[in-house]
């Protein structure tokens, strides 16, 4: 009996010592489940949902309306020697691109546009949603609050995506040839430094921030007016209401911000260092007159209006499907 008791006590002691080790090993064997749970929790976060909805809506609108952006860029960068005495419009540029670069030439710059718009629109909607939840606590924004929220969200997205915007503009102009988006970023950084990757950022923010602020204000106020007292509105009509309000808001916001867009395009295409907004604006005025600040206004208004209207329509529908209030 005495001999057999010793091994039993040793086994109990060993079991006591081993249990923490076993538990530690067991927890180490199940990290994948913990990771899956963490990922699932993150994916269920409302801000992540808003980001995903915005990214998907941005992808759809970019694929459809990229040709309008290319035509806008080409119109804004026409030189007087290219135009001659006659006036060149969107149709003339469209026919020239199709004739010299084929129909697919209208989608030149598609890669940087997708790289820019997919995360860019996602960042915008994600920032906008989180800002609304934090500052407004679910209350509908006033006109001034809409302007501030729109401008702030667009500024965050604009700064994050500025290098890709520069590459996209140069692709679309036809004046630069890069092998890929990465090669373009590397070439710009090597030849122009980090400043080259953010060329035209101020003009971009002066264009995009007011556009988004005004757009959100017009969109929110128009939508609230249309839906006022219409609680029984058929759900099938909501996409049409959202799209119509988006078109109206886009036209107004595009007209106000067109000059800043022209200045931005010229700055991003220039390789001259330390060229400020005033210098570019003066050059445009001397070369093209006041009309030069509205070159490409038709394709830009069409593109921005339709893109924003479609993006918001898809975003609103997807957020509603996920049970979230946009």
Curated annotation (Swiss-Prot):
**Keywords of the record:** Membrane, Mitochondrion, Mitochondrion inner membrane, Repeat, Transmembrane, Transmembrane helix, Transport
Solcar repeat start-end pairs: 45-134, 141-225, 237-321
- Write one Gene Ontology MF term: glycine transmembrane transporter activity
Q: Does the keyword Cell cycle apply?
A: no
Q: Would the keyword Transmembrane helix be found if you checked this record's keyword annotation? A: yes
Q: Which domain of life is it from?
A: Eukaryota
Question: Which GO terms of type biological process are on file?
Answer: erythrocyte differentiation; glycine import into mitochondrion
Q: What is this protein called?
A: Mitochondrial glycine transporter
The entry's function note states:
Mitochondrial glycine transporter that imports glycine into the mitochondrial matrix. Plays an important role in providing glycine for the first enzymatic step in heme biosynthesis, the condensation of glycine with succinyl-CoA to produce 5-aminolevulinate (ALA) in the mitochondrial matrix. Required during erythropoiesis. Plays a role as pro-apoptotic protein that induces caspase-dependent apoptosis.
Q: Report the PANTHER family cross-referenced here.
A: MITOCHONDRIAL GLYCINE TRANSPORTER (PTHR46181:SF3)
Q: Which reaction does it catalyse?
A: glycine(in) = glycine(out)
Which cellular component terms (GO) are annotated to the entry?
A: mitochondrial inner membrane; mitochondrion
Q: How does it sit in the membrane?
A: Multi-pass membrane protein
Localization, per the record, is:
Mitochondrion inner membrane
Q: Where is the signal peptide?
A: none
Q: Which family does it belong to?
A: Belongs to the mitochondrial carrier (TC 2.A.29) family. SLC25A38 subfamily.
Transmembrane segments annotated in the record for this chain:
51-76, 109-135, 147-172, 200-223, 241-267, 296-314
């Amino acid at each position: 009996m005495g001999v057999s008791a010793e091994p039993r006590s040793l086994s109990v002691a060993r079991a006591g010592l081993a249990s923490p080790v076993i538990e530690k090993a067991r927890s180490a064997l199940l990290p994948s489940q913990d990771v899956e749970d963490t990922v699932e929790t993150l994916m269920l976060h409302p801000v992540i949902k808003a980001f995903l909805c915005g990214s998907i809506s941005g992808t759809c609108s970019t694929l459809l309306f990229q040709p309008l952006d290319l035509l806008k860029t080409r119109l804004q960068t026409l030189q007087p020697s290219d135009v001659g005495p006659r006036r060149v419009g969107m149709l003339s540029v469209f026919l020239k691109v199709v004739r010299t670069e084929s129909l697919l030439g209208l989608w030149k710059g598609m890669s940087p546009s997708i790289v820019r718009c997919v995360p860019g629109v996602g960042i915008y909607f994600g920032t906008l949603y989180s800002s609304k939840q934090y500052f407004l606590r679910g209350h509908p924004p006033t006109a001034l609050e809409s302007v501030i929220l729109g401008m702030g969200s667009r500024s965050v997205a604009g700064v994050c995506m500025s290098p890709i915007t520069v590459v996209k503009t140069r692709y679309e102009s036809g004046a630069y040839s890069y092998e890929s988006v990465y090669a373009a970023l590397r070439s710009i950084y090597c030849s122009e430094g980090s400043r080259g990757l953010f060329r035209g950022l101020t003009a971009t923010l002066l264009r995009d921030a007011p556009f988004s602020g005004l757009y959100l204000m017009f969109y929110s106020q128009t939508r609230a007016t249309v839906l006022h007292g219409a609680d029984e509105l058929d759900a099938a009509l909501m996409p049409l209401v959202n799209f119509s309000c988006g078109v109206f808001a886009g036209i107004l916001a595009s007209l106000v911000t067109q000059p800043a867009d022209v200045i931005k395009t010229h700055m991003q295409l220039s390789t001259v260092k330390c060229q400020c907004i005033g210098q570019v604006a003066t050059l445009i005025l001397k070369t093209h007159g006041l009309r030069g600040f509205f070159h490409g206004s038709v394709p830009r208004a069409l593109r921005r209006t339709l893109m924003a209207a479609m993006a918001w329509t898809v975003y609103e529908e997807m957020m509603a499907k996920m049970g979230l209030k946009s």
